[in-house]
């Protein structure tokens, strides 16, 4: 839980355009890792989580060194070990360069690899590490906000060339889950957010 905590500002700001929000400049905070937890709705690791939950059941999100976070950390690491090692080395060499995005309850919307790298470094070196991130006043229990959160996730993780591409299976599952199961948006809305034209639909 981040809301209500006294957090240090880093002095940085991050520009982020969000539908329905007037302010697009947000202050960056140094957030203790124990306040944060992974996003169980993240499209990149949905297939890994579904496979796990089919045998072990669903997990309840918990911050800090919880079983939930340890399992999701493993999902993130194994989803792309090469990118994970590069992110970890980059943080060791130059600290965290790009702020993440966090919700008031501590859910990390953007920055899974950075969070994982920081958690691993803190654990291996017995160091106090902070996750630099902006805090968006959005709530996953609100259906309206849930759609905005998904739009933001797609824009940050899929709509920019420098991001590591989705695994094809994760992409297909995320499309199906977002459109058919959760009914958060239409196929055209999804495609526009990930910058794919009509002829190359994911399904």
Descriptions of predicted regions:
Residues 125-173:
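Short, flexible helix-coil linker/hinge segments at the edges of structured domains or between repeats
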Residues 168-184:
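Short, amphipathic alpha-helical "recognition" segments used to contact nucleic acids or chromatin
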Residues 194-203:
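Single conserved hydrophobic/aromatic residue that forms the stacking wall/gate
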Residues 182-192:
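Short, charged amphipathic recognition helices of the HTH superfamily
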Residues 1-129:
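Short, charged/polar connector segments at secondary-structure boundaries
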Residues 90, 155-157, 178:
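Residues that form generic nucleotide/phosphate-binding pockets
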């Amino acid at each position: 839980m981040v809301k209500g905590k006294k957090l240090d500002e880093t002095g940085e700001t991050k520009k982020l355009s969000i539908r329905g929000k007037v302010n697009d400049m947000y202050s960056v905070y140094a957030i203790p890792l124990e306040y944060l937890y992974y996003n169980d709705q993240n499209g990149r690791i949905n297939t890994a989580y579904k496979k796990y939950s089919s045998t072990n059941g669903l997990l309840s999100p918990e911050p800090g060194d919880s079983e939930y976070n340890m399992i999701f950390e493993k999902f993130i690491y194994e989803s792309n070990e090469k990118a994970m090692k590069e992110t970890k080395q980059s943080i060791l060499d130059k600290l965290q360069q790009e702020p993440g995005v966090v919700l008031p309850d501590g859910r990390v919307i953007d920055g899974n690899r950075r969070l994982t790298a920081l958690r691993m470094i803190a654990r291996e070196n017995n160091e106090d590490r902070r996750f630099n991130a902006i805090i968006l006043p959005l709530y996953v229990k609100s259906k309206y906000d849930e759609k905005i959160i998904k739009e933001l996730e797609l824009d940050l993780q899929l709509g920019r060339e420098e991001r590591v591409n989705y695994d094809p299976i994760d992409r297909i599952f995320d499309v199906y889950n977002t459109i058919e199961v959760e009914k958060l948006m239409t196929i055209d809305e999804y495609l526009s957010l990930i910058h794919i034209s009509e002829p190359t639909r994911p399904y």
